[in-house]
Regions:
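Structured aminoacyl-transfer and RNA-binding surfaces used for tRNA recognition/handling
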Residues: 1-174
Length: 174
């Protein structure tokens, strides 16, 4: 049957998976994450959640800020509690565009950068650099392990991220 079965699709977690802290001290609390299973079958029953798989992507999280983590490792209740929620706009866009509006999962290439958000930036970088963006996604983050195209693609993504960051900063008057 189609749809959400809470017994199957809601995955229990522990403090490592379901408790958010910004650092050793400060506001914190339990959290929930919403993931999308991008496997061809479309349902791995939560086995890929928080395993670093490109086929199971977190698109949304909710943090129920209700504690303060103290330097001695204890937690104090906060006088005011709130929910901090965040959705990955680029992640949602990449899933929608990469799966042809959730219709084709088998041949999907899901990357925040394989969207119409980044293509105009990559086009301009190609013109200015004389290099082509290949869309490779290296298995390793070790720069020494990358081939020439992977290194070029990483550089394109870094430049594009910096351009977007600067655009937002300029728009905010910074």
């Amino acid at each position: 049957s189609l749809g959400l079965d809470p017994k199957v699709h809601i995955v229990d977690g522990n403090k490592n998976d379901n408790f958010w802290m910004m650092g050793d001290t400060g506001p914190c609390g339990p959290c929930s994450e919403i993931h999308v299973d991008l496997t061809p079958e479309g349902d791995t029953r939560g086995t890929l959640v928080n395993k670093g798989s490109a086929e199971c992507i977190e698109i949304w999280n909710l943090v129920f800020i209700q504690f303060n983590a103290n330097p001695d490792g204890t937690f104090s209740a906060l006088p005011a509690k709130h929910v901090d929620t965040g959705m990955g706009f680029e992640r949602v866009t990449s899933i929608i565009q990469g799966t042809k509006n959730f219709t084709r999962f088998a041949e999907a290439t899901i990357s925040n950068y394989e969207t119409d958000i980044f293509r105009p930036i990559f086009d301009e970088i190609e013109i200015l650099s004389g290099k082509k963006y290949g869309g490779t996604l290296p298995a390793s983050s070790e720069l020494a392990m990358l081939d020439a195209q992977q290194a070029t693609d990483v550089a394109f993504r870094v430049i594009a991220d910096h351009i977007r960051t600067l655009s937002f900063a300029i728009a905010d008057g910074i």
